């Protein structure tokens, strides 16, 4: 077998009288006695990828060995077909590429070697906020405000589009990247230079996994890994375990795809599938259309899996037809999948690492909350669940049921009242069944004389223009409008924390009385402080239930048994499956997809009017508070040996489930934060602070925003919420940023201690970049979430785990200790053991064992070079 081209496996496949080349995985499997039909479909895609990417016989044999034990510790190189980005993560990625060009020039290389070698699509969707709502002109007002706030960022992206090859930008106001990917960008089977191969991707957003519902293998990575992939570097990975989920039956009653994904999230999070593939199979697939599957795949990060994959079948073809893909492309998919044994075979049993079963008929109406997406609650238990959770919000129980008057209004609010009801997120707005269902419920509510409660902020932010088109065509848009669910934008909005301000009088009442009010949204995450700083409780649910809770205005109601209005119950308003299906059949067609996506890259007049300089390197403006040349390459070219960590101080001691939102928040910038001080020092008014997410192109803001989440709890500061620590150099309580800068000034390294699932949530690389710039050398935790561990390695930060059942709690740390980490050397290997020496102020010394969570040779190289970016630049220079 040739290691260079594997040319003996190139075969011809004729489709519509055109001949294409394919890499025949059946023949390659036969040559190594690999029973291909026993291999999970997701691994068949990887097998083809390795074969086509010049994989050696040894790398192909890894798949055969996998079948023996259904797991592996062998690594493979994955070469994705393309990269998907959104603007919050995309801007810093393009900043990094621009800085890499400068670095390449600095060390005497060719700056133009820094160029994407595979297609990169960036969709601007993360910057629109719900400033205006419940009005006909809300969309236009929010778009205008978005452009005003982000004109410098958008001009930078437009510069990048002309400066880099293979890089396209979908302008703002078009859609959400994952829904655009599902409905338009994804091909299922890619063809380039006459060769056919499975579509695959990585994305700089954790919910890139959504497209696995359309049988396109992909997952989220940090921006720095995505940059490496763009520049032709393979993504080295351990061949994962694959958990099979056998689906049977069909959804019944009021259960929707949203309820299904919340059930799957609850089930799989308990199963601990972090770092594993999940693959769905069974007769139940026949009862799930692609939109339902996409909802399930979207929330893979929430259940912890690398991806949730659905094989190609007839539903895939039907969706490609519905969304207006070219007929030739559809035939390519069908014939290629059949030829390569990628078409789902209901008769042939695949072998999985483990198999779980889920009967779809057992799924019930649900919400998930109040703080984690895996905490599913049956609809009839929501009120009691909220009451049970209230003490966890440090509430004084004596006033738990008290109502408080809102100034200048004729209503009162109290704990459990819903102040935000948002139909938002690609997770659900990509699914016509729940969107039509929400509109039909709105129609019936109005017919029964019901209105949304006046303290509820309502919004509709779909993931593509097709949604508003079919709502308009069906005549149902007017009912959502009348209830206040007017279009506010085509973007992520409330789901990522861009919910905008509440009514000032409501905000005052909440703050003055310490109320625990809630948001109900059709999103995928509800981590504390994420949706809005004032909604401590957030529940996820279907768009239909979002409308229902907007009508009730409170969580303190059992919607299954208590009336929403006078003698009006949820069952009186709930649309039947037949009603929903009839509207879908009459209102959704392929022509609307073709029309709405025909000018996807054009943009508004404001976008077209943005003027940029044609140049290969970026002209940095040192006074910019949005785009700044990062300091990652100051020591480019210098030898960066791995050294033991000596006399480090503890910057923070954190608990379980610390999310990337806690580490690097995306939402609003507090007026009292270090980032706010930096901005005001640069003459930026608080009204123009924008969000942390929008300023990820400026490292000065992002360093100051690291660990600045108002809900984070550092165990070194008892009873204090927010980004504070004890500076051991002077014994005072300071912001984490200020203390870190003091340590840096005194050449003192710092480390972090944490609990389980450190770095869960979004893929944001700033949750690794920020700590790196603060001087963090290592994070010591019980476990890491997949993407964040990779990001830490990519920034040269050591991810270390305890051995056995040890935890930070066993160590009885107070933060005053001095830390040594020994055993690091040029000869580190995967899962390298090291010693951690903890020196107490009393003089007591304790030594514990830790494991360095580095998996592959490439990751070892990243650590040795100081970061993945240094490694890539120096490799490309040659």
From Swiss-Prot:
[4Fe-4S] cluster binds at residues 426, 492, 495. SUPFAM superfamilies: Aconitase iron-sulfur domain, LeuD/IlvD-like. Monomer. It comes from the Bacteria. It holds the Pfam family Aconitase_C. Binds 1 [4Fe-4S] cluster per subunit. The lineage of its organism: Bacteria, Pseudomonadati, Pseudomonadota, Alphaproteobacteria, Rickettsiales. It comes from Rickettsia conorii (strain ATCC VR-613 / Malish 7). Involved in the catabolism of short chain fatty acids (SCFA) via the tricarboxylic acid (TCA)(acetyl degradation route) and probably the 2-methylcitrate cycle I (propionate degradation route). Catalyzes the reversible isomerization of citrate to isocitrate via cis-aconitate. Could catalyze the hydration of 2-methyl-cis-aconitate to yield (2R,3S)-2-methylisocitrate. The apo form of AcnA functions as a RNA-binding regulatory protein. Keywords: 4Fe-4S, Iron, Iron-sulfur, Lyase, Metal-binding, RNA-binding, Tricarboxylic acid cycle. GO terms for biological process: propionate metabolic process, methylcitrate cycle; tricarboxylic acid cycle. Belongs to the aconitase/IPM isomerase family. Pathway: Carbohydrate metabolism; tricarboxylic acid cycle; isocitrate from oxaloacetate: step 2/2; Organic acid metabolism; propanoate degradation. Its cofactor is [4Fe-4S] cluster. One of its GO terms (molecular function) is 2-methylisocitrate dehydratase activity. Its EC number is 4.2.1.3, 4.2.1.99. This is Aconitate hydratase A. InterPro entries: AcnA_IRP_Swivel (IPR044137), Acnase/IPM_dHydase_lsu_aba_1/3 (IPR015931), Acoase/IPM_deHydtase_lsu_aba (IPR001030), Aconitase/3IPM_dehydase_swvl (IPR015928), Aconitase/IRP2 (IPR006249), Aconitase_4Fe-4S_BS (IPR018136), Aconitase_4Fe-4S_dom (IPR036008), AconitaseA/IPMdHydase_ssu_swvl (IPR000573). It catalyses: citrate = D-threo-isocitrate; (2S,3R)-3-hydroxybutane-1,2,3-tricarboxylate = 2-methyl-cis-aconitate + H2O.
